[in-house]
């Protein structure tokens, strides 16, 4: 009789014991030296995982009693990395982070271990985001990681307006010529306008003038001078005096300026590259007259006072929420004829005009507030049913492809007004909840720290309004809450609220701001509003109609301006500020 017995996890058991022997310096027959640090190991183990070690053993005709010594340059691999590599060779486990991925890639290259290289490649793909895509592109080019290179390049191209801004330019000025030239040549480059592209080129050349001046002539040809403003052309002309062989470029600039003097002034928009960005307000979903739900996606182009239809949502809903993050718009929740609180979530790609289904929200929500902070999308509060509010704050985790509970507000609310400060803090200001059995807006400010998942500051203050307020920051610590009846200035440092004499005028149709309106701050103290319900002039009839107009409030002078009429009158649509590529104008 014969019986076969197999030990479970025997290979792992053997390697674990070999690793213990290595750390105790037992039975070793090779050593790696890095900057006075000596690491002992077993030749057979390393030869099995590293073609480098196997080659050294075979090429030197080593005998079983011989010992192998390898000296590693500490400028290439640190002692800590070599120790981590040895642990990986013996256990097959490795922890990769943004801090150690470059050295691990060097280690994979040095020891010629393809599997470790694959792990590093996968980590880079899963962890890439706006703030690190420039560094990841450098790594991808250095270690020939094509998929990472393509993703990182797309990340830089899609966020060029950030990298060329004062906030991002400190790192971007180190961009190598081959990458910088490729970006300027790209018709889909996301610049604010061609002015930014020309200014970025001049700043990049002057950052290392002696070595980069030779690239200026070639890269200058990638700029469409007809799309550049007179002010920036004059700036460029002055800068050219500091560069050699600039006469041809100066002549081109002078030619454009002279032509403009002789022609009728016209918009530069038609000359912009396809990827140039347009500040826009995007309206999604909503409810039409007679109760029909909408799936249309419309964009108001601020610069042109023009409405466009972008797309159609994959579902019809009102009281949903939306936020923009880079080239994407995220939408979730809402109500339909059949379901009062939807879990569904989608992502719209403004560049490709395409939709991607996302994992469902953990719970169905209406009147929740979606917001982007630090490049991450959050959903704040909301209702799961009439008069049933939640305090949950959800975060969409791009790596896990899941909605995760980020934390909770101090009290359950829907219809909250939210403003961000930096890349870390959400300020959740007022919201609707049940007070003594009645739906009422409460005066509360929660400062939610997205890193800790905690409300780090909660301030309550008396309010005399039940409509949706407008928010803005004055100086660094003063949060202004503007409404029709009263305005409040909250000192976040002293935790003190003071009434202000300024107030928000009623809409031109004499209605107050409400959760049914699409409301969007668009910078420079201006607020966009459209849709929502309006009460009939005869108060006795108590009839409600949907507001067909769009308005713009200039808070500096306290006046409303009526804008181009929206394509449809909508109640409770989602609304967000977005930067749309100029190529969408070609769809008109």
UniProtKB/Swiss-Prot annotation:
An annotated GO BP: spermatogenesis
Modified residues (Phosphoserine): 149
Start and end residues of each BACK domain: 133-235
One annotated GO molecular function: ubiquitin-like ligase-substrate adaptor activity
Gene Ontology CC: Cul3-RING ubiquitin ligase complex; cytoplasm; cytoskeletal calyx
Keywords, ordered alphabetically: Cytoplasm, Cytoskeleton, Developmental protein, Differentiation, Kelch repeat, Phosphoprotein, Repeat, Spermatogenesis
Tree of life domain: Eukaryota
Chain ranges of the BTB domain: 28-98
Disulfide bonds: none
Protein localization: Cytoplasm, Cytoskeleton, Perinuclear theca, Calyx
SUPFAM superfamilies: Kelch motif, POZ domain
Matching InterPro entries: BACK, BTB/POZ_dom, Calicin_BTB_POZ, Kelch-typ_b-propeller, Kelch_1, SKP1/BTB/POZ_sf
Segments annotated as Kelch repeats: 280-327, 328-375, 377-423, 425-475, 476-525, 526-580
Function: Required for both nuclear and acrosomal shaping during spermiogenesis.
Protein name: Calicin
UniProt source species: Rattus norvegicus (Rat)
Lineage: Eukaryota, Metazoa, Chordata, Craniata, Vertebrata
Gene: Ccin
């Amino acid at each position: 009789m014969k019986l076969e017995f197999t030990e479970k996890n025997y290979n792992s058991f053997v390697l674990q014991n070999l690793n213990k022997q290595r750390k105790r310096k037992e039975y070793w027959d090779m050593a790696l030296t890095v900057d006075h640090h000596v690491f002992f190991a077993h030749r057979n183990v390393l030869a099995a995982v590293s073609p480098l070690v196997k080659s050294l053993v075979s090429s030197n005709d080593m005998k079983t009693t011989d010992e192998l010594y390898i000296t590693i340059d500490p400028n290439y691999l640190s002692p800590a990395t070599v120790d981590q590599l040895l642990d990986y060779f013996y256990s097959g486990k490795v922890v990769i982070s943004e801090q150690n991925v470059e050295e691990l890639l060097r280690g994979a290259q040095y020891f010629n271990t393809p599997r470790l290289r694959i792990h590093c490649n996968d980590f880079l793909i899963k962890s890439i985001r706006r703030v690190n895509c420039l560094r990841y592109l450098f790594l991808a080019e250095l270690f020939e990681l094509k998929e990472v290179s393509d993703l990182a390049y797309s990340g830089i191209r899609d966020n060029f307006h950030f990298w060329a801004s004062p906030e991002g330019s400190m790192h971007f000025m180190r961009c190598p010529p081959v990458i910088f030239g490729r970006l300027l040549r790209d018709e889909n480059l996301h610049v604010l306008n061609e002015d930014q592209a020309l200014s970025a080129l001049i700043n990049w050349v002057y950052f290392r003038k002696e070595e980069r001046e030779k690239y200026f002539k070639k890269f200058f040809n990638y700029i469409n001078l007809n799309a550049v403003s007179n002010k920036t052309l004059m700036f460029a002309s002055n800068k050219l005096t500091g560069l050699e062989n600039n006469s041809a470029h100066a002549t081109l600039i002078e030619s454009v300026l002279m032509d403009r003097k002789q022609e009728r002034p016209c918009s530069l928009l038609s000359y912009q590259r396809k990827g140039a960005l347009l500040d826009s307000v995007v309206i999604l979903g909503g409810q039409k007259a007679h109760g029909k739900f909408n799936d249309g996606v419309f964009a108001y182009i601020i610069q042109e006072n023009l409405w466009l239809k972008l797309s159609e949502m994959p579902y019809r809903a009102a009281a949903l929420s939306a936020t923009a993050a880079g080239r994407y718009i995220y939408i979730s929740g809402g109500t339909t004829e059949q379901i009062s609180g939807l879990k569904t979530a989608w992502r719209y790609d403004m560049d490709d005009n395409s939709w991607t289904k996302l994992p469902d929200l953990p719970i169905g929500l209406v009147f929740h507030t979606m917001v982007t902070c630090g490049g991450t999308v959050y959903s704040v509060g909301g209702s799961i049913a009439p008069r049933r509010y939640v305090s949950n704050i959800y975060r969409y985790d791009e790596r896990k492809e899941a909605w995760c509970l980020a934390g909770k507000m101090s009290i359950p609310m829907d219809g909250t007004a939210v403003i961000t400060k930096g890349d870390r803090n959400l300020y959740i200001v007022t919201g609707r909840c049940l007070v003594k059995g009645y739906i009422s807006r409460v005066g509360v400010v929660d400062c939610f720290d997205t890193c800790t998942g905690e409300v780090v500051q909660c301030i309550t203050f008396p309010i005399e309004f039940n409509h949706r307020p407008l928010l803005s920051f004055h100086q660094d610590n003063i949060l202004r809450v503007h409404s029709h009846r009263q305005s409040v200035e909250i000192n976040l440092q002293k935790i003190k609220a003071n009434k202000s004499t300024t107030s928000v005028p009623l809409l031109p149709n004499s209605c107050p701001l409400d959760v049914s309106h699409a409301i969007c701050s668009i910078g420079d103290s201006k607020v966009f509003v459209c849709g929502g319900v309006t009460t009939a002039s005869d108060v006795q009839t108590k009839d409600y109609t949907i507001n067909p107009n769009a308005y713009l409030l200039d808070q500096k002078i306290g006046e409303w301006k009526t804008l181009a009429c929206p394509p449809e009158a909508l109640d409770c649509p989602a609304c967000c500020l977005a930067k749309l590529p100029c190529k969408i104008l070609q769809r008109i």
